[in-house]
């Protein structure tokens, strides 16, 4: 709405100026332009709601650093493990600092496939760290997990760009080439003197499924590391809610529902998915809902362990916490 403060930068392509930048106050013209360009969601600053676990401007900064790291890796076929460790520590520190009963996970929407690649790594680091923290991992374990998550797709630098960013569904031969990114990624880790088995497994095995239907090896539950099982959830969720040239984004609610279904079918780790839902809720930030009072609202935060009782903003601008409201329930998702 006009007058609200944007919490993300939106641009349609690298060679065009942003429609709106982080921190800008929205004007009526900006709102109309966003609608005309098909932008469905825009995160705005909402007072009296818990700050996001990682601020959007911080995500933007980390994305640019990942972009530089991937660029260097494309030339040298190796990464500076100290740079990755520093980024990992930033993510872990922010999330641990902001981890409480009331959480707000805000992810950035990218309109460009290449930019998606970089922000996807940051999102994977954030989501994986949240799952790990909720699952009781210690700081040193979280650091390794986050490290693996923010380079889990590093091997894609060796996949031809015309295939990686093809504005269509890939054919079988092309998809086989894309699959190799996990193998390429583990090689880059070795070239970079990254020897931690947890990190290498997170990079190499994040597309494995517990029922053996994943790739590259078709490994099953007992053969897949905790790190890879966590990153798999983060990878799928962020991919589903993201715009790509060949598909539209799913709503956060639909994506969560798909994650839960994959766990029930034995593809994703059920306990880790429960930890994920515990922190992001059944109705993630950005979900539009209808209440039994007839009012419409948008989810702006969640209470850990209260998956069906998010923090909402009503159409009149009032914020309410369903965990503290008796008799008020969600009856329908409107996304």
Locations of regions flagged by a protein language model:
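Terminal helices and disordered tails flanking the catalytic cores of nucleotide-processing hydrolases
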Residues: 1-86, 90-91, 249-335
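Short hydrophobic/aromatic segments of transmembrane alpha-helices and their interfaces
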Residues: 14, 139, 221-222
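Short, contiguous strand/loop micro-motifs
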Residues: 16-19, 115, 172, 214
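Alpha-helical scaffolding flanking metal-ion-dependent phosphate/phosphodiester catalytic sites
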Residues: 124, 147-158, 176-187, 191-273, ...
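Acidic/His-rich, divalent-metal-binding segments that scaffold phosphate/diphosphate chemistry
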Residues: 46-179, 186, 190-196
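Short alpha-helical linear motifs
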Residues: 111-112, 165-173, 203, 223-227, ...
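Sparse recognition of residues in long alpha-helices and their boundaries
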Residues: 39, 50, 104, 140, ...
């Amino acid at each position: 709405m006009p007058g609200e403060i944007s919490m993300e930068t939106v641009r349609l392509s690298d060679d065009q100026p942003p429609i709106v930048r982080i921190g800008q106050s929205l004007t009526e013209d900006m709102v109309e332009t966003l609608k005309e360009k098909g932008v469905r969601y825009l995160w705005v600053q909402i007072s009296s709601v818990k700050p996001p676990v990682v601020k959007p401007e911080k995500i933007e900064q980390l994305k640019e650093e990942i972009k530089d790291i991937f660029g260097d890796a494309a030339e040298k076929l190796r990464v500076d493990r100290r740079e990755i460790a520093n980024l990992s520590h930033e993510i872990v520190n922010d999330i641990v600092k902001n981890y409480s009963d009331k959480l707000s996970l805000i992810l950035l929407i990218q309109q460009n496939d290449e930019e998606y690649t970089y922000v996807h790594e940051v999102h994977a680091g954030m989501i994986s760290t949240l799952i790990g923290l909720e699952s009781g991992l210690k700081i040193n374990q979280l650091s390794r997990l986050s490290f693996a998550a923010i380079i889990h797709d590093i091997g894609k630098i060796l996949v031809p760009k015309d295939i990686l960013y093809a504005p269509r569904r890939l054919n079988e031969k092309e998809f086989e080439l894309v699959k190799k990114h996990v193998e390429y990624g583990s090689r880059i880790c070795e070239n970079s003197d990254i020897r931690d088995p947890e990190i290498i497994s997170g990079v190499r095995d994040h597309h494995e499924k517990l029922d053996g239907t994943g790739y590259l090896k078709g490994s099953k539950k007992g053969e897949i590391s905790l790190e890879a099982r966590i990153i798999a959830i983060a990878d799928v969720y962020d991919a589903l809610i993201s715009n790509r040239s060949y598909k539209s984004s799913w709503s956060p609610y639909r994506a969560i529902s798909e994650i839960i279904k994959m766990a029930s079918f034995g593809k994703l780790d059920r306990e880790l998915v429960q930890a994920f839902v515990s922190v992001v809720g059944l109705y993630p930030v950005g979900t539009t809902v209808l209440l039994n009072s007839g009012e419409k609202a948008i989810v702006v935060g969640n209470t850990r362990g209260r998956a069906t009782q998010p923090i909402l903003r009503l159409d009149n601008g009032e914020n309410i916490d369903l965990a503290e409201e008796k008799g008020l329930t969600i009856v329908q998702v409107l996304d």
